[in-house]
Curated annotation (Swiss-Prot):
Entry-linked Gene3D superfamilies: Complement Module, domain 1
GO cellular component assignments: cell surface; extracellular space; inner acrosomal membrane; plasma membrane
Membrane topology: Single-pass type I membrane protein
Coiled-coil regions listed: none
Pfam families, A to Z: Sushi
Extracellular side, ranges: 43-311
Complex and partners: Interacts with C3b. Interacts with C4b. Interacts with moesin/MSN.
Protein name: Membrane cofactor protein
Lineage, uppermost ranks: Eukaryota, Metazoa, Chordata, Craniata, Vertebrata
Length: 361
């Protein structure tokens, strides 16, 4: 008994696949055609201008023969008064030509303030420009120092602020001080750069008054003096005695403000500190008095480096030693080479039993 099996075959679907691929190919071929510009009977968007804008609201499209009327922006005015500024959509779907038809308005010309000056930052008074105000020496500015040309009521332009004024710089009398006075104390007001000088009164006691601080004050601003007033007080320092030392210069029975003394130590003692001291405003020596100590002198703290080879110190000595060693080494090498060459120049021949000495140059 025989059994035969016939293999089953899958149904063929190639025609359907080919049809699907064909449709996709047609889509790819037709897609670029959809992107091609189509002819239209309308003009594109109208051009933009810096000084002008369209009147009203723009339409989505304009047909040939239609026009757009322009007007000036705020702060601008027509170059030619009465001229109609318009664009026309032409038959070829392009706009007619139109130039900028407006220009910037100008603010009123400003005069220099009394005792001052107005500076045109942009070199003109056109819309959007600015000016700066400055006062002459001895005067201060009252008001706003910068003004801008901007849109005012309606379509006009004007300056943003009123012009300032330049007022004379004056100072009130400077402060009075105890035990002292200043010049021109009878005046109620002082002008710019005017100077007053302070001085101390005579003392009723055994010690005189010292003027501590600036003796001259200058009116530098509106109600402002150059510095604080000085003081008149007794400034007296004690006798600058140091153990194992003496005064070199600046001797005096009393030592008042800014008295200067030079000190030195006795033989065998060294000075630690400053040799020159000054009587300060707090009745103390500045800097403090030095000390004289027996023994070796103190190390210099701020000695300047000497000039020449001495300033090089140990580094210079090391360089000299290295240079000498290198020189000796070179001489030894030359000597060894010379001896080796002499040995190469002597040889013996077996035929004549002679020694020929050859000298190599």
């Amino acid at each position: 008994m025989r059994a035969s099996c016939t293999p089953l075959k899958a149904p063929l679907r190639r025609p359907e696949r080919l049809a699907s691929s064909g449709r996709f190919a047609w889509v790819l071929l037709l897609a670029p055609l959809l992107l091609l510009p189509t002819s239209s009977d309308a003009c594109d968007d109208p051009p933009r201008f810096v000084s002008m804008k369209p009147q009203g609201t723009l339409k989505p499209s304009y047909s040939p023969g239609e026009q757009i009327v322009y007007e000036c922006h705020l702060g601008f005015q027509p170059v030619t008064p009465g001229q109609v500024l318009a664009l026309v959509c032409q038959d070829n779907n392009t706009w007619s030509s139109l130039q900028e038809g407006c220009k910037k308005r100008r603010c009123p010309t400003l005069a220099d303030p009394t005792n001052g000056q107005v500076i045109l930052v942009n070199g003109s008074t056109e819309f959007g420009s600015e000016v700066h105000y400055v006062c002459n020496n001895g005067y201060y500015l009252l008001g706003t120092n910068i003004s801008y040309c901007e849109v005012s009521s309606g379509t006009g332009v004007n300056w943003s602020d009123n012009p300032p004024t330049c007022e004379k710089i004056l100072c009130q009398p400077p402060p009075e001080i105890q035990n002292g006075k200043y010049t021109n104390s009878h005046k109620d007001v002082f002008e710019y750069n005017e100077v007053v000088t302070y001085s101390c009164d005579p003392s009723n006691g055994p010690d005189e008054y010292s003027l501590v601080g600036e003796s001259k004050l200058t009116c530098i601003g509106n109600g402002e003096w150059s510095s604080q007033p000085p003081q008149c007080k007794v400034v007296k320092c004690v006798y600058p005695a140091i153990e194992h030392g003496t005064i070199v210069s600046g001797f005096g029975p009393k030592y008042y403000y800014k008295a200067t003394v030079v000190l030195k130590c006795n033989e065998g003692f060294n000075l630690y500190g400053n040799s020159v001291v000054v009587c300060g405003e707090n009745s103390t020596w500045e800097p403090e008095l030095p000390k004289c100590i027996k023994g070796h002198p103190p190390r210099p703290t701020d000695a300047s480096p000497p000039n020449g080879a001495e300033g090089l110190g140990a580094g210079y000595i090391v360089l000299v030693i290295v240079a000498v060693l290198i020189g000796v080494g070179l001489l030894l090498c030359l000597y060894c080479c010379f001896c080796r060459q002499r040995k190469k120049g002597i040889y013996v021949t077996g035929e004549s039993h002679r020694q020929d000495i050859l000298f190599s140059l």
